[in-house]
């Protein structure tokens, strides 16, 4: 189902990065966690239209490969690469069936990727494929919906999103509908919110160590733009969280 959802979104996915939660929360938090990529190779899993792939290349990564299951997303990423060449490579691929890549990468990143696994076994399979694609000691960074997010807290609409439970429960956790309030047409995506222990157990079983959760933050630019009070509800109940570990 996730393939169809993202194929239908296509280039509109780029608009997500302009919404306050993403622009001033997700992007600076995630890039800050990953840190210095100069001279390193990066594997971007569920790369979408290539936003982070391009950003890592601009920041000095030597080799960046973006992989996504959506044909349409990869088509858009390649189109952008043609218009603004950065020497980023993209390929269509399912992380749960990731092919041997012919080399190992220094850094792996997965933004809203592992939460599309339909079961704990599928999530562990994703993690094993990622682990074998990284150099020993390589770092893996995850950005995902917060496992224990309270859906009954203040609305996220002023930050550009709605996050609602669908009422369904999967093997790994509740299912949720996230709506990006884009103009002129909002876009909704349904995925699972795996429990914290599911992530941790699957990563460790796949050979990862030093598993650590990292909280979402708001950038100084976001505070200057909107003021501290604007972000109070978001920081009291952040809908997103990050995770880092080592291969």
Predicted features and spans:
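A short SAM/SAH-binding and catalytic strip from SAM-dependent methyltransferases
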Residues: 107-121
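Conserved class I S-adenosyl-L-methionine
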Residues: 1-37, 51, 55
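Mobile, glycine- and charge-enriched loop segments
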Residues: 31-43, 140-142
């Amino acid at each position: 189902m996730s393939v169809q959802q993202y194929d239908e979104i296509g280039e509109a996915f780029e608009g997500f990065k302009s919404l306050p939660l993403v622009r001033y929360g997700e992007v600076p938090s995630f890039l800050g966690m990953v840190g210095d990529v100069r001279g390193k190779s990066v594997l971007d899993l569920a790369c979408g239209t290539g936003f982070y792939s391009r950003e890592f290349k601009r920041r000095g990564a030597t080799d960046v490969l973006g992989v996504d299951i959506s044909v349409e997303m990869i088509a858009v990423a390649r189109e952008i690469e043609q218009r603004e060449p950065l020497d980023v490579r993209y390929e269509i691929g399912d992380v749960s069936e990731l092919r041997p890549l012919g080399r190992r990468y220094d850094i792996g990143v997965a933004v809203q990727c592992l939460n599309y696994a339909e079961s704990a076994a599928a999530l562990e399979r994703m993690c094993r494929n990622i682990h074998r694609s990284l150099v020993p000691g390589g770092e893996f960074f995850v950005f995902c919906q917060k496992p224990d997010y309270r859906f009954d807290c203040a609305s996220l609409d002023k930050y550009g999103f709605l996050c609602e439970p669908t009422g369904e429960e999967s093997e790994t956790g509740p299912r949720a509908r996230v709506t990006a309030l884009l103009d002129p047409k909002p876009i909704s995506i349904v995925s699972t919110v795996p429990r914290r222990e599911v992530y941790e157990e699957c990563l460790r079983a796949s050979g990862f160590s030093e598993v650590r959760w990292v909280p979402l933050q708001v950038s100084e630019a976001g505070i200057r733009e909107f003021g501290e009070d604007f972000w109070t509800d978001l920081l009291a109940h952040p809908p997103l969280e990050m995770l880092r570990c080592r291969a």
